[in-house]
Amino acid sequence: MKTLTILFVAAIMMGVGCSKSEDSENNPDKPDKPSPLPDLPDPNDVCSCMDDIIFMQYCYDNFDVNKDGKVSKIEASAVAKIDLARQEIKTLTGIGYFSNLEILNCKECHELTTVDLSNNLKVRIGDEMFYTCSKLSKIVLPNNILEIGESAFYGCSSLKNIDIPDKVT
């Protein structure tokens, strides 16, 4: 398994520039903390900070358990999987409120440009997670990931740099 992981990381490095994240002790400009969550215009609705209508509607349709027209922080924390494959989403602003998210599928989201998963400490970077997201130009990974799945960033032609946490082997 370790050989496959090493070969996969080597393959990523050929197509995308990578750099290891440095510990906050060695580099005070790069703290080992997640990015701040966006402000919530409606403190009772995590979707109120989302700037992508398709992502927002997906969340209302799938996670508004009590059907009050809002996705509360409690409802968001119960979400373990978000499947956005082949959706025309551009950003995932607000995804950090889904604190127990384990599985994210953005395969073939050709319009997706930026993703910040630094607050999603349980998410796994699975196989083909961002497969052919050709406009993806920036991604922030959680500092605690241990491995990156096969072809996770295959076809992400706009992605020129990924900071890979030190724990990834």
Spans of features found by a protein language model:
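Intrinsically disordered, low-complexity serine/threonine-rich segments
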Residues: 11, 22-27, 38, 121, ...
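Disulfide-bonded cysteines in secreted/extracellular proteins and peptides
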Residues: 18, 47-49, 109, 133, ...
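Consensus positions within tandem repeat domains that build extended binding/scaffold surfaces
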Residues: 127-131, 149-154
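Structural signature of tandem-repeat unit edges
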Residues: 89-103, 110-124, 134-147, 157-169
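N-terminal capping/linker segments that flank leucine-rich repeat
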Residues: 18-103, 119, 143, 166
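Intrinsically disordered and other compositionally biased segments
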Residues: 6-7, 152, 166
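Bacterial Sec-dependent N-terminal signal peptides
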Residues: 1-28
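Small side chains
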Residues: 10-11, 15-17, 106, 126, ...
